[in-house]
Design a protein with these regions (language model features):
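Active-site-proximal beta-strand/loop segments in catalytic clefts of secreted hydrolases
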Residues: 16, 44-46, 131, 154
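Right-handed parallel beta-helix
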Residues: 85, 98-176
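Short, T/G/N/S-enriched strand-turn elements that build extracellular solenoid repeat scaffolds
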Residues: 22-33, 48-57, 63, 73, ...
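Right-handed parallel beta-helix/beta-spiral solenoid domain characteristic of secreted/periplasmic
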Residues: 15-17, 40, 59-115
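Bacterial Sec-dependent N-terminal signal peptides
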Residues: 1-5
Length: 176
């Protein structure tokens, strides 16, 4: 077999078990480290309650939801749980480079009891297309100086300091 035939470049996540994986973290962990080709993870509509981490060795991945309104990644940590502090409250943490999110919702649905990050970014060249980010305080943390982020056609909801951090981020055609 050639290398092209051996690699799997499309994975499917479904809550009902009809796809390759039942949760998104398992699909991310199945991606080979430091790939030079793109893997697309298709995520079917559903609510995925998980604390998703995309590590630094995962790159060139697209996470594509079935719809922004009905493909939901959610968690409910907040800064006042076990003295967690702001930066460990994320629902999704992206440390890998060249990662794209499309047509999905990332939310931190913690009660308004303190900081509760929905998206924590540390990777470079991250793109978010037609996504929704829902939270209260500190919804999006752009965590790495020099990193470049693009948000296009996104909806971002929060109450206090809901976008913060040192990265360079461009928000085009977004509703805040």
């Amino acid at each position: 077999y050639s290398q092209q035939q051996q690699r799997k470049d499309t994975l499917v996540v479904t809550r009902d078990g009809t796809g390759d994986y039942r949760n998104i973290q398992e699909a991310v962990e199945a991606v080979r480290a430091f790939m030079d080709y793109t893997v697309t993870i298709y995520i079917k509509n559903g609510t995925y309650k998980e604390k998703l981490v995309i590590p630094s060795w995962v790159k060139n991945v697209q996470l594509v939801g079935e719809s922004a309104e009905n493909t939901i990644i959610t968690y409910d940590d907040h800064a006042n749980i076990n003295k967690m502090g702001t930066f460990r409250t994320y629902t999704v943490k992206v440390s890998g480079n060249d990662i794209t999110f499309k047509d999905l919702t990332i939310e931190n649905n913690a009660a308004p009891l303190g900081q509760a990050v929905a998206l924590h970014t540390e990777g470079d060249r991250l793109m978010f297309i037609n996504c929704r980010f829902l939270g209260n305080q500190d919804t999006i943390y752009t965590g790495s100086e020099g990193a470049r982020l693009l948000f296009t056609n996104c909806y971002i909801e929060g109450t206090t300091d809901f976008i913060f951090g040192p990265s360079t981020a461009l928000f085009e055609y977004c509703e805040l």
